[in-house]
C-alpha cells in the first residue's frame, strides 16, 4: 500500500471538492450508474431497501439483518470488551453502515433518580401541615392534634361501624357534604392517628407502606383513645382515635425548616416544613456518547483481516469522534426530532429559563377563593316576628338551624399569576444558582461531598436574588447564571425523553442498539473475507449516564451490568454476479474507499487557571498547507473527563459533557484573540475594521461605536462569524438558508440582551442596600428563601429603584450576549474575504514549503474555577481504505498539516 508521501496529490484532493466520478475508475462509475435504479452508491450514503428479484441463489442473501455472536467477552471492572468474527462470504458485500451493537443488561440509576417534580405523596397538603398524631408534652404527658371525620356512635367498645381496626376507620373517608359539621350536627366521629413514638414529619410527602391487603399501615397494636368536647357536662365520648405506629417514610421530600433535636417530639415539631426533592432525570447520553471507548492513547478498537492482522482503526489523541458525529447528524437531519433506536434526543434547555423575559404578570383582575358554602361568615340567629310596634321571638314552625351571614360573601384573595411566575423562577432558576449563593438551613446537616444528591437537595437559594421584581421589564439572563451549565436542568427535554425510554423506576433492564461512530469504518463496504472486529464499552456510570443535576452517580449508588452484546449487520441486497462485479472493482486501488472525518480537526485543550484573563498558546513550526482555520470555545475542567482512561477517578460529575456532546455555553466569556505567525505575513490583513492579527470579540466600553445588535459583540466579530458560518458578508446581511442555519450555527444561538441599571455615580441619594436588607412582599414571603415559612408584616417595599414613571431614577445601559452550542470560528485565508474557497492563490504566502510557528493569545473573562480552552485546528483528516485481497484490509490515515497515521505499519 502506498504511503502518503508517495501520492502528494491526496493532500488537495478534498480541498477542490471533486466529484466521485473524477477519481474513480470509469468501470466503477459505469457500474454505479447501471445499478442506481435499486442501489445508490453515491458518496457512500446508502439506503439499501430493495432486494433483487433475480440471480439470488440462497435465502441468506435476502435477509435484512444477520446476528453475529461474540467469540470472546471480557467483563472487567471498568470496561466490557467483546470480539466478533465477521465472515463475509463470496459474492457478498457487508455494509458496515448498517451494523450496530445490540446490548442487554440491567441498570440501577441509584437513589438520586427522581423522574418528576414535586411529590407523589399528599401533594395537596400544606408544606407544614401535620398528620393526625399524638406528640409529647412535659414529662410523660401526651398531647393530641387530629381531625375526626368518620361519623358514628361511640361506645366503650369503640365505634360500631369499625369491625377491623387494623385498617378501619380509613383516613380517606368522611362526610361528603359541606353541610355536615356546619349546618347539621356531625355527632360522634373517629379517625386514625400516629402514636407519639412515630417520628414527626409533615403530611406533605409522608408515606407509610401498607401492612395488610386492606391498606392498613400499623406495625404493632392499634390502641383506642377517647375524647369529649370540653364544654360538654356529660361523661360521654365525642371523639375516638385509633392510634398506631407506622413505618413513616419520605421517599421524595426533605425538610427545609427543621427544629432542633430536643424539640422534634414536642409541639414545635409539628411546624416543620417539607419541600420536594429536586427532579433528577437519569438516562444514557445522546447517541450513547461515552459508552463506546474510543481510546486516545492506543487502540481499543480493532477491525483487522485475519489474513494480514493489520488493525484498520487508528484513533488519535486529538480526534473528535463523538463531537464529529453530533455535528454530522445536525447537517443531515433535524436534531429536534428524536430517534429512539440510537437514543437520539439532543440535549436542550428551555429558552425562558436561560434568558428570563420578565414582562411582569397579568394580574389586573384579582383572584378570589370562597368557602364551600358560597356564603359567610355565618352567625347563629333567632327568628323574630312583629308584635304591634315591637319584635318578639317567633317560635311558630321555626327549626333549630337559623344562620345568616352579614355583608358580602367571605372570600380570600390570591395573586395566582404572580405566584405561578414566582414559582417558575424559583424552581427553574433560583434552585440552579451557583452554590456560593445558597445556604444550609438551621438544624440541617449537609453532607461534606458537594457533588452528592443529598447535598444539592438541602441547599436553599437566598431570597431576592431571583424574584418577580428582579430585572422586571427586561429580557436578561441573571449574570451569575451565565456560567452555569443550562443543559443540567430538569427542563432538558432530550435528557428527559432518554430517561423515560428506560422507564420511571430506579431499577430497570435495558435493551439498546448502539451505532459505530468511528469515521474510517462506519461507512465501509467490507469485501469478502474473514475479519476480527473488537471493541470495548465503558461501565463508568458518570461517563455513560447523564443526570439533570450532574451529581456524582458513583457516590450516589448508580451501577450498570452488561449481560450480552451481539452485533447486527446487513449485506447489500445484490444479486451475486452484481456483488462480485462491485468487489472486483473495489479491489483495485484506484477505487479505494476514502472517508473524511466530519469535523476533520485536531483538538487541543489548554488549561485556564481560576481567575485568569490572559492565555498565550504556541504551536511549533509546521507547514500550514491544507489548513482550514480555527474553531474554539471554553469548557469547565470539572465537566471534562480524561478520554484516555476507561475510568477517570477525578471525574465526579454526570451532567452534559460539552467536550463530547456540543453543549457549549461559555462562548460569551471570550474578549479577544490574536493570531501571529512567525512570518512577515500580516494575517489576516488590514481589510477589516480592527488591527491585523487581532480579533476583538466584545467590548465592555464602546466609545467608538464598534458594537452591534444592541449587545457588546463587535461588528468585526459578527462579520467574521457570518462569513465563517454562512459566507454572508459584503453582499449584505440577511438570514442564511435553512440548510446552513442548523442547531449549532451562530445566528440561531446568538442572543443579544440589554437592560438599564441605576446610575450610581449620578444618583446622589442611591443606597446600596444589601440583599439581606431588601424587602419586597414583606409579610407575604420569607426573608430567607422562597421555601421557608413567610414572615413579617405588610410594609412599603424598599427595592428595586423605579426605572420608569415620573420618579424614574438616572440609569445606565448594560449590554451583553450569549451564544450557546456554537463554536467560534476563524477561517484561514490570507485574503480574508475569500473564505468561501481555499485556493493556492489566496494562501500563497503560507502555502510555501517553509514552516511557520504560530502564537495565539486569548483574552477571556475571569472565572472562579479552572476551565479549559478548547481549540479545534481544522485540518484534513482522511482515511483511505484498501482491500486488495481476501481477508486483507489496509488503511492510510492522512492528516494535513498536523499528523498522519498508517495502519499498514
From Swiss-Prot:
It is found in: Virion; Host nucleus. The modification N-acetylalanine is found at residue 2. GO terms for cellular component: host cell; host cell nucleus; T=25 icosahedral viral capsid. InterPro entries: Adenovirus_Pll_hexon_C, Adenovirus_Pll_hexon_N, Adenovirus_Pll_hexon_sub2, Adenovirus_Pll_hexon_sub3, ADV_hexon, VP_dsDNA_II. Pfam families: Adeno_hexon, Adeno_hexon_C. The record marks 729 as: Involved in interaction with pre-protein VI. It comes from the Viruses. Its main location: virion. Homotrimer. Interacts with the capsid vertex protein; this interaction binds the peripentonal hexons to the neighboring penton base. Interacts with the hexon-linking protein; this interaction tethers the hexons surrounding the penton to those situated in the central plate of the facet. Interacts with the hexon-interlacing protein; this interaction lashes the hexons together. Interacts with host dyneins DYNC1LI1 and DYNC1I2; this interaction might be involved in intracellular microtubule-dependent transport of incoming viral capsid. HAMAP family: ADV_CAPSH. Major capsid protein that self-associates to form 240 hexon trimers, each in the shape of a hexagon, building most of the pseudo T=25 capsid. Assembled into trimeric units with the help of the chaperone shutoff protein. Transported by pre-protein VI to the nucleus where it associates with other structural proteins to form an empty capsid. Might be involved, through its interaction with host dyneins, in the intracellular microtubule-dependent transport of incoming viral capsid to the nucleus. This is Hexon protein. It comes from Canine adenovirus serotype 1 (strain CLL) (CAdV-1). The lineage of its organism: Viruses, Varidnaviria, Bamfordvirae, Preplasmiviricota, Tectiliviricetes. The gene is L3.
Amino acid at each position: 500500500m502506498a504511503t502518503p508521501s508517495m501520492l502528494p496529490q491526496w493532500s488537495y484532493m478534498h480541498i477542490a471538492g471533486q466529484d466521485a466520478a473524477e477519481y474513480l475508475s470509469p468501470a466503477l462509475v459505469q457500474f454505479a450508474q447501471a445499478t442506481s435504479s435499486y442501489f445508490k452508491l453515491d458518496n457512500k450514503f446508502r439506503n439499501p431497501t430493495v432486494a433483487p428479484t433475480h440471480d439470488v441463489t440462497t435465502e441468506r442473501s435476502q435477509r435484512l439483518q444477520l446476528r453475529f455472536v461474540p467469540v470472546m467477552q471480557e467483563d472487567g471492572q471498568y470496561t466490557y470488551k467483546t470480539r466478533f468474527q465477521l465472515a463475509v462470504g463470496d459474492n457478498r458485500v457487508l455494509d458496515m453502515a448498517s451494523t450496530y451493537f445490540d446490548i442487554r443488561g440491567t441498570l440501577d440509576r441509584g437513589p438520586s433518580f427522581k423522574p418528576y417534580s414535586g411529590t407523589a405523596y399528599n401533594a395537596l397538603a400544606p408544606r407544614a401541615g401535620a398528620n393526625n398524631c399524638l406528640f409529647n408534652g412535659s414529662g410523660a404527658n401526651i398531647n393530641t392534634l387530629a381531625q375526626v371525620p368518620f361519623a358514628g356512635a361511640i361506645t366503650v367498645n369503640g365505634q360500631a361501624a369499625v369491625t377491623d381496626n387494623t385498617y378501619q376507620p380509613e383516613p380517606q373517608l368522611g362526610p361528603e357534604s359541606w353541610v355536615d359539621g356546619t349546618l347539621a350536627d356531625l355527632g360522634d366521629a373517629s379517625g386514625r392517628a400516629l402514636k407519639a413514638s412515630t417520628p414527626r414529619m409533615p403530611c406533605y410527602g409522608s408515606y407509610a407502606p401498607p401492612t395488610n391487603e386492606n391498606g392498613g399501615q400499623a406495625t404493632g397494636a392499634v390502641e383506642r383513645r377517647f375524647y369529649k368536647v370540653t364544654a360538654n357536662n356529660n361523661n360521654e365520648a365525642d371523639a375516638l382515635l385509633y392510634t398506631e405506629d407506622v413505618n413513616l417514610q419520605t421517599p421524595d421530600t426533605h425538610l427545609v425548616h427543621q427544629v432542633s433535636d430536643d424539640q422534634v417530639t414536642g409541639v414545635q415539631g409539628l411546624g416543620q416544613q417539607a419541600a420536594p426533592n429536586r427532579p433528577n432525570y437519569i438516562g444514557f447520553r445522546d447517541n450513547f456518547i461515552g459508552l463506546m471507548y474510543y481510546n486516545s492513547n492506543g487502540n481499543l478498537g480493532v477491525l483487522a483481516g485475519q489474513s494480514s492482522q493489520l488493525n484498520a482503526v487508528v484513533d488519535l489523541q486529538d480526534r473528535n469522534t463523538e463531537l464529529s458525529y453530533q455535528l454530522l447528524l445536525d447537517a443531515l437531519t433535524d436534531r429536534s426530532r428524536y430517534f429512539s433506536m440510537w437514543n437520539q434526543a439532543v440535549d436542550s434547555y428551555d429558552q425562558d429559563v436561560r434568558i428570563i423575559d420578565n414582562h411582569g404578570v397579568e394580574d389586573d383582575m384579582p383572584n378570589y377563593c370562597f368557602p364551600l358554602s358560597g356564603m359567610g361568615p355565618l352567625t347563629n340567629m333567632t327568628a323574630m316576628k312583629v308584635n304591634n310596634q315591637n319584635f318578639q321571638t317567633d317560635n311558630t314552625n321555626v327549626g333549630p338551624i337559623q344562620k345568616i351571614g352579614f355583608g358580602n360573601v367571605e372570600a380570600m384573595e390570591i395573586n395566582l399569576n404572580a405566584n405561578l411566575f414566582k414559582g417558575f423562577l424559583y424552581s427553574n432558576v433560583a434552585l440552579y444558582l451557583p452554590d456560593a449563593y445558597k445556604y444550609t438551613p438551621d438544624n440541617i446537616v449537609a453532607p461534606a461531598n458537594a457533588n452528592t444528591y443529598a447535598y444539592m437537595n438541602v441547599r436553599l437559594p437566598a431570597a431576592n436574588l431571583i424574584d418577580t421584581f428582579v430585572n422586571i421589564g427586561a429580557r436578561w439572563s441573571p449574570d451569575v447564571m451565565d456560567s452555569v451549565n443550562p443543559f443540567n436542568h430538569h427542563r432538558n427535554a432530550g435528557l428527559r425523553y432518554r430517561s423515560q425510554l428506560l422507564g420511571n423506576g430506579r431499577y430497570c433492564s435495558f435493551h439498546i442498539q448502539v451505532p459505530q461512530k468511528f469515521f474510517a469504518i462506519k461507512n465501509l463496504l467490507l469485501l469478502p473475507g474473514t475479519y476480527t472486529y473488537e471493541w470495548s464499552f465503558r461501565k463508568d456510570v458518570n461517563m455513560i449516564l447523564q443526570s439533570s443535576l450532574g451529581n456524582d452517580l458513583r457516590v450516589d449508588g448508580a451501577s450498570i451490568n452488561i449481560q450480552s452484546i451481539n452485533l447486527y449487520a446487513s449485506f447489500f441486497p445484490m444479486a451475486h454476479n452484481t456483488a462480485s462485479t462491485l468487489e472486483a472493482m473495489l479491489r483495485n486501488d484506484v477505487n479505494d474507499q476514502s472517508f473524511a472525518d466530519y469535523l476533520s480537526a485536531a483538538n487541543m485543550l489548554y488549561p485556564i487557571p481560576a481567575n485568569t484573563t490572559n492565555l498565550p498558546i504556541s504551536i511549533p513550526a509546521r507547514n500550514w498547507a491544507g489548513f482550514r482555520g480555527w474553531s474554539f470555545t471554553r469548557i469547565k475542567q470539572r465537566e471534562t473527563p480524561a478520554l484516555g482512561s476507561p475510568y477517570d477517578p477525578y471525574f465526579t460529575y454526570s451532567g452534559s459533557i460539552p467536550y463530547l456532546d456540543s453543549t457549549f455555553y461559555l462562548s460569551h466569556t471570550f474578549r479577544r484573540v490574536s493570531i501571529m505567525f512567525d512570518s512577515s505575513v500580516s494575517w489576516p490583513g488590514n481589510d477589516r475594521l480592527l488591527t491585523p492579527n487581532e480579533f476583538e470579540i466584545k467590548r465592555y466600553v464602546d466609545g467608538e461605536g464598534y458594537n452591534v445588535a444592541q449587545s457588546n459583540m463587535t461588528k468585526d466579530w459578527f462579520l467574521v462569524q457570518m462569513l465563517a458560518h454562512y459566507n454572508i458578508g459584503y453582499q449584505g446581511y440577511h438570514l442564511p438558508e435553512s440548510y446552513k442555519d442548523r442547531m449549532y450555527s451562530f445566528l440561531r444561538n446568538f442572543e443579544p440582551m440589554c437592560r438599564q441599571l441605576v446610575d450610581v455615580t449620578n444618583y446622589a441619594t442611591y443606597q446600596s442596600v444589601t440583599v439581606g436588607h431588601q424587602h419586597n412582599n414583606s409579610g407575604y414571603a420569607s426573608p430567607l428563601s422562597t421555601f421557608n415559612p413567610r414572615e413579617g408584616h405588610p410594609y412599603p417595599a424598599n427595592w428595586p429603584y423605579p426605572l420608569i414613571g415620573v420618579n424614574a431614577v438616572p440609569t445606565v445601559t448594560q449590554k451583553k450576549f450569549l451564544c450557546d452550542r456554537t463554536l467560534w470560528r476563524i477561517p484561514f485565508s490570507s485574503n480574508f474575504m475569500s473564505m468561501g474557497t481555499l485556493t493556492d492563490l489566496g494562501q500563497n504566502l503560507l502555502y510555501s514549503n517553509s514552516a511557520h510557528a504560530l502564537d495565539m493569545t486569548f483574552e477571556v473573562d475571569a472565572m472562579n474555577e479552572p476551565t479549559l480552552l478548547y481549540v479545534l485546528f481544522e485540518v484534513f483528516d482522511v482515511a483511505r481504505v484498501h482491500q486488495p485481497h481476501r481477508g486483507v484490509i489496509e488503511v492510510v490515515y492522512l492528516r494535513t498539516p498536523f499528523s498522519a497515521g498508517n495502519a499498514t505499519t
